[in-house]
Amino acid sequence: MDAPIEVKNLDHVVVHFSGDSGDGMQLAGNIFSTVSATVGNDISTFPDYPADIRAPQGSLTGVSGFQVHIGAGKVYTPGDKCDVLVAMNAAALKMQYHHCKPQSTIIIDTDSFGSRDLRKADFSSDDYLGEMGIDPDRVVACPITTMVKDCLADSGMDNKSILKCRNMFALGLVCWLFNRELALVFDFLRKKFAKKPNLVDANIKVVQAGYNYGNNVHASVPNTYRVETTEKVPGRYMDITGNKATAYGLIAAAEKAGLRLFLGSYPITPATDILHELTKHKSLGVTTVQCEDEIAGCASAIGAAFAGALAVTSTSGPGICLKSEAMNLAVIDELPLVIVDVQRGGPSTGLPTKSEQTDRSEERRVGKEC
């Protein structure tokens, strides 16, 4: 008889989903995060998109990821090292393993670890675990692609659509690891794909298959996890991003100051969400203008400041360079101006989907140019 599986009781745990762009890691991570928040955990998430427009499948530069930090108490960051890593292909394992703790549980899709996949991911041999120094006992090696194809063989779906359901198998397995109620996952899927009932049925079936796989092979899993939950106080809850929180903060600041809020902005990733969110709240005294370029966005905000509004312009690194002339105009005119810089990787045009804190030195000197 197999010994009972160890259950790790943790105050907080970090889970990282990773795979190709298009493997649905963002959706799987979002669902798991929502379920965890619903049962009473505090969460902080970090989506990671490849900077390439369309990287080759299975390549190192095309790895997409989603990290969630789950806690019994307050959680303030997405976490650093992960306790559980889901790697849907060899490139994901190669790129993300350095984020793992020494005793992390690693889930892989063995169907995506063929010789060709390993060469694409810059492995020098077929012994990828040995090459990276990974303890095989910490790895849940599952033929996810094969099992999803078998699960949906009679669904009438084409092969491409079937492969898009692999993320749900991984999600089901992770839900088993954390003893999450699948009913919450199913409810999410029914709402998400309400207009596509066939897709709802297929995804539910695959999630259940992943969960059952965990039950059936639990002896090969080093341990499962338990994070204490708390009973939520009844009220209104929402998923909130940094950009949305910034938008709400600006609205609140304008209200407290007794001023109208004006945002003059030019769309630029990853700051555009602030413009999108504020545009929804014209009834709260918010005026937004999508300008023709970065300089115009800043100049329009300066005009609004002169007229007595709480004036804001939003941008990212490349836009700061372009706005510098207008920013100095605000300085010499002694007009208050809020500039939101949602930083991305640089230099020059930079990496729209990556984060970096490298604009600060430039920003400290912008007002000294005049």
Predicted regions and their residues:
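Thiamine diphosphate
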Residues: 12-100, 269-362
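Conserved small/polar residues in nucleotide/adenosyl-binding loops
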Residues: 363-370
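Active-site cofactor/cluster-binding pocket
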Residues: 1-257
